[in-house]
């Protein structure tokens, strides 16, 4: 059976350890947000008794939940959640003790989050992870991928029914081996292009055009991947990446 070592602090403020089986559930103590303050930037040699000596003479008996955090490649950070007795005005404690020099360190005192605030913060983080990265879309341009490498402006113009000058290929970036200079090819593209539609009528739209050309095939039978382009002036950066360039015709 796998085991893990858990750190605790005894009644004298000294660190002790115990060994518990893996997957053993350790009941977490629920903090009362109306009676608890966060105390941060504690000295590395701070112990529970030091905190009792700091707070109890003025605010009565306290309960200390000492924790420590050690970010990678950063100094050890020590902080604690201190729970006061009923009737203690946390606002006054914070006003008096926040920024106080304690064992040569300037401590930071903050209120802890309420259940509602924790729930809201958790939902916000979850939404940021799951929400799609919505971007404004163009009203007259399609972005097309999977284009045969030998395709020309005229080839795509024939498929999409636009003027060849409205076809902008994303050009390949090449390196001149003699000079090591980077340049953009006039001959080779990346298989991507922007198709601009002029004067879309009231009964037409770029969304309709996108649906119309979904699944359309090139002359060699390859299926073109079509979507609405992002509404950015420099669409090359949006769709083509850093190593490409749109060839303006």
Curated annotation (Swiss-Prot):
<dbReference type="GO" id="GO:1990904">
    <property type="term" value="C:ribonucleoprotein complex"/>
</dbReference>
<protein>
    <recommendedName>
        <fullName>Ribonucleoprotein 1</fullName>
    </recommendedName>
</protein>
<dbReference type="GO" id="GO:0042254">
    <property type="term" value="P:ribosome biogenesis"/>
</dbReference>
<dbReference type="InterPro" id="IPR000504">
    <property type="entry name" value="RRM_dom"/>
</dbReference>
<keyword id="KW-0677">Repeat</keyword>
<dbReference type="InterPro" id="IPR012677">
    <property type="entry name" value="Nucleotide-bd_a/b_plait_sf"/>
</dbReference>
<keyword id="KW-0694">RNA-binding</keyword>
<feature type="domain" description="RRM 1">
    <location>
        <begin position="35"/>
        <end position="114"/>
    </location>
</feature>
<dbReference type="GO" id="GO:0003723">
    <property type="term" value="F:RNA binding"/>
</dbReference>
<dbReference type="InterPro" id="IPR050374">
    <property type="entry name" value="RRT5_SRSF_SR"/>
</dbReference>
<dbReference type="Pfam" id="PF00076">
    <property type="entry name" value="RRM_1"/>
</dbReference>
<feature type="domain" description="RRM 2">
    <location>
        <begin position="140"/>
        <end position="231"/>
    </location>
</feature>
<dbReference type="GO" id="GO:0005634">
    <property type="term" value="C:nucleus"/>
</dbReference>
<dbReference type="GO" id="GO:0005737">
    <property type="term" value="C:cytoplasm"/>
</dbReference>
<dbReference type="InterPro" id="IPR035979">
    <property type="entry name" value="RBD_domain_sf"/>
</dbReference>
<dbReference type="GO" id="GO:0003729">
    <property type="term" value="F:mRNA binding"/>
</dbReference>
């Amino acid at each position: 059976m796998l085991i893990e070592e858990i750190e605790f602090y005894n009644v004298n403020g000294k660190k002790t350890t115990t060994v518990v089986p893996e997957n053993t559930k350790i009941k977490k103590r629920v903090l009362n947000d109306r009676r608890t303050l966060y105390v941060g930037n504690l000295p590395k040699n701070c112990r529970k008794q030091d905190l009792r000596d700091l707070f109890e003479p003025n605010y009565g008996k306290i309960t200390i939940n000492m924790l420590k955090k050690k970010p990678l490649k950063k100094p050890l950070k020590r902080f604690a959640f201190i729970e006061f007795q009923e009737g203690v005005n946390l606002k006054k404690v914070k006003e008096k003790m926040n920024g106080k020099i304690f064992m040569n360190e300037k401590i930071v005192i903050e209120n802890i989050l309420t259940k509602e605030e924790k729930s809201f913060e958790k939902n916000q983080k979850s939404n940021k992870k799951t929400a799609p990265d919505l971007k404004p879309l163009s009203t007259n341009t399609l972005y097309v991928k999977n284009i045969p490498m030998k395709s020309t402006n005229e080839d795509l113009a024939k498929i999409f029914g636009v003027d060849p000058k409205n076809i902008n290929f994303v050009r390949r970036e090449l390196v001149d081996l003699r000079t090591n200079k980077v340049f953009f090819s006039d001959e080779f593209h990346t298989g991507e292009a922007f198709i601009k539609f002029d004067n879309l009528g009231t009964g037409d739209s770029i969304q309709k055009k996108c649906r119309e050309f979904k699944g359309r095939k090139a002359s060699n039978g390859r299926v073109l991947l079509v979507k609405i382009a992002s509404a950015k002036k420099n669409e090359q950066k949006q769709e083509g990446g850093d190593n490409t360039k749109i060839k303006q015709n």
